């Protein structure tokens, strides 16, 4: 990647105030980095403002949380330069041909040992060079009304996006009309468009209305969904899927292979946020018959089934979407095949869904209605749960309220491995890129302190893009021990120094360590040098012409520029030297 520098290490640092796990982390990290000369100016924005800025690379830096997936490629693909386009879905836009090559080799790897080695290599490279810096994985802590039962607790937390199972089978009463599930969101969803939604609030709603081809179970294993079975060719490039028969769209139209072919073909062709990454994997999608399709891949891809199950690739109805610009589709009245039908939405206030009576899983869902309410403040959401106005909330309960919840017999506290990887990112696409600064930041952040202060100790420090809690053996064991002095040293050697004493480092150019020369043994005894009197030195300087001084200055500037010292910094030094010489001349004349 091409180096992009700025005058000083000062960045606008955006954060979402309603997501405390990342927002509080942002405060702590800003203070930690200030100690090594990096200034992050915290600016809290609502998601309706912050997300468009991030998606269009109109930012300097930000703190946020990234939902996890058991598919390593879901994480790694976002670092491919092909996704460095506004609105495509990679917020941090890493542009490195070497990283691209590694990702492409991973996609094609068929040998497990080679696959493992490549994944280790790319994690180490990204950890030391990328503007994406992971901080910690949350531990999910969620409060729910005690009357609800038969929910599933799986990685990611209760009722998270991958947990369709709770929304299918949990209930609180034997009377169907009483099984109305009310959930509080801190902010409204951004989209009902399955092709373009990137936030987990939007995807939570979309996940209930639409279906993917495959899903994962509570053990993170791939299971059939709209696709009932599959076969893989010997060369690993062709996947043939049998589709579920008897499924209907919410408007009564039968679901067929045409819908699947349309969804993936147009999603990729129109470079939509959710499907764009598949352009590097899928060559084409073909209809075999009304209930059989083929995915023909460009190369073998070891994680393809997991990709389909966890990539949020929801199938849409061709008869509704054909001819639309899918990137601009507002989708005001979603029509899916999922367990719930869209009923009503008042933007900024609530969304209502109702049970799909013709859902293809018999007896599901048990819930008859879902009501999402927007309640911005964490304490207000908690009080609404206590009062029975809502049953739970979309994200984890604020840690400061958990102990209070444990004492209430009407509430239950559910813990699980968290879904959210809290991270910070810098805009390396248009604003700043210096891998040495990012490496220094890795050492300057005390992750244990961040976990403790930002999330009450509910979390796990993370140093690389993959982590053992979601990716098992594929996660690197690389760590960066908290060491602010090492961070300072890296910054100094990279040419970042605080030259004006304001606590923020400026760029003066990299320093080149000098290697002392080994003295040679003289062949003849040295004579004792005669030390000239001070006035003799000054007199000599007096006779130095202005032209000579200029020549010396020019020569020194030229020489040092070759080794990377900026001319501006050196010129200032020479001016100071000349002033000192003039003062010495003046003093010498006075003494005469």
What are these regions (language model features)?
Residues 1-4, 430, 441, 512-592:
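Secretory targeting signatures
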Residues 184-232, 265, 335, 455:
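N-terminal lobe/hinge region of extracytoplasmic solute-binding protein
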Residues 228-272, 288, 294, 381-384, ...:
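Aromatic- and charge-enriched surface segment that lines or borders ligand/interaction sites
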Residues 17-30, 52-181, 185-189, 199-205, ...:
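Detector for C-terminal structural segments
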Residues 1-68, 112, 140, 183, ...:
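Ligand/substrate-recognition segments at binding pockets and active sites
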Residues 146-147, 242, 276-321:
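Surface-exposed binding/hinge segments that line
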Residues 7-18, 40-43, 177-188, 228, ...:
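Short, well-ordered beta-strand elements
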Residues 39-41, 46, 328, 358-403:
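Ligand-site clamp/hinge motif
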């Amino acid at each position: 990647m091409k180096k992009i520098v700025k005058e000083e290490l000062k960045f606008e640092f955006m954060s979402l105030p309603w997501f405390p796990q990342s927002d509080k982390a942002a405060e702590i990290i800003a203070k930690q980095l200030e100690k090594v000369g990096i200034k992050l100016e915290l600016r809290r924005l609502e998601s309706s403002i912050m997300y468009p800025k991030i998606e269009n690379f109109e930012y300097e830096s930000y703190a946020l949380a990234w939902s996890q997936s058991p598919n390593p490629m879901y994480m790694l693909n976002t670092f491919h330069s092909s996704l460095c386009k506004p609105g495509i879905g990679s917020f941090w836009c890493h542009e490195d041909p070497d990283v691209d090559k590694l990702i492409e080799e991973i996609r094609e790897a068929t040998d497990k040992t080679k696959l493992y080695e490549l994944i280790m290599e790319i994690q180490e490279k990204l950890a030391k060079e990328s503007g994406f810096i992971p901080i910690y994985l949350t531990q999910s802590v969620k409060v729910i009304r005690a009357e609800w039962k038969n929910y599933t607790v799986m990685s990611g937390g209760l009722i998270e996006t991958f947990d369709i199972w709770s929304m299918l089978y949990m209930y609180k009463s034997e009377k169907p009309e009483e099984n109305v599930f009310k959930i509080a969101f801190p902010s409204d969803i951004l989209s009902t468009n399955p092709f373009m939604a990137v936030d987990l609030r939007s995807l939570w709603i979309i996940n209930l209305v639409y279906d993917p081809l495959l899903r994962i179970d509570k053990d993170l294993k791939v299971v059939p969904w709209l696709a009932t079975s599959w076969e893989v060719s010997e060369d690993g490039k062709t996947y043939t899927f049998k589709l579920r028969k008897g499924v209907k769209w919410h408007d009564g139209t039968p679901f067929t292979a045409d819908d699947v072919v349309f969804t993936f073909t147009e999603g990729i062709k129109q470079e939509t946020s959710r499907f764009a990454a598949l352009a590097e994997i899928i060559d084409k999608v073909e209809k075999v018959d009304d209930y059989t399709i083929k995915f023909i891949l460009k190369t073998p891809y070891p994680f393809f089934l997991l990709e389909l199950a966890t990539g949020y690739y929801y199938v849409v109805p061709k008869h509704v979407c054909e001819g639309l610009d899918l990137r601009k589709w507002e989708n005001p009245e979603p029509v899916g095949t999922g367990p719930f039908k869209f009923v009503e939405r008042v933007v900024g206030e609530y969304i209502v869904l109702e049970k799909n009576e013709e859902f293809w899983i018999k007896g599901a869902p048990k819930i008859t209605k879902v009501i999402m309410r927007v309640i911005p403040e964490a304490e207000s959401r908690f009080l609404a749960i206590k009062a029975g106005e809502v049953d739970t909330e979309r994200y984890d309960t604020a840690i400061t309220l958990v102990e209070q919840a444990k004492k209430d017999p009407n509430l239950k506290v559910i813990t699980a491995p968290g879904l959210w990887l809290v991270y910070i990112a810098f805009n390396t696409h248009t604003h700043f890129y210096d891998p040495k600064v990012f490496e220094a930041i890795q050492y300057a952040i005390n992750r244990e302190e961040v976990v403790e202060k930002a999330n009450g100790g509910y979390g796990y420090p993370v140093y690389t893009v993959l982590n053992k809690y979601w990716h098992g053996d594929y996660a690197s064991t690389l760590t960066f021990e908290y060491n602010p002095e090492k961070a300072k040293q890296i910054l100094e050697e990279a040419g970042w120094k605080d030259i004006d004493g304001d606590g923020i480092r400026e760029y003066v150019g990299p320093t080149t360590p000098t290697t002392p020369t080994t003295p040679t043994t003289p062949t003849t005894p040295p004579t004792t040098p005669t030390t000239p009197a001070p006035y003799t030195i000054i007199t000599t300087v007096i006779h130095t012409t202005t032209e000579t001084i200029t020549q010396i200055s020019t020569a020194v500037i030229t020489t040092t520029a070759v080794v990377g010292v900026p001319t501006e910094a050196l010129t200032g030094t020479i001016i100071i030297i000349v002033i000192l010489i003039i003062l010495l001349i003046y003093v010498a004349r006075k003494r005469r």
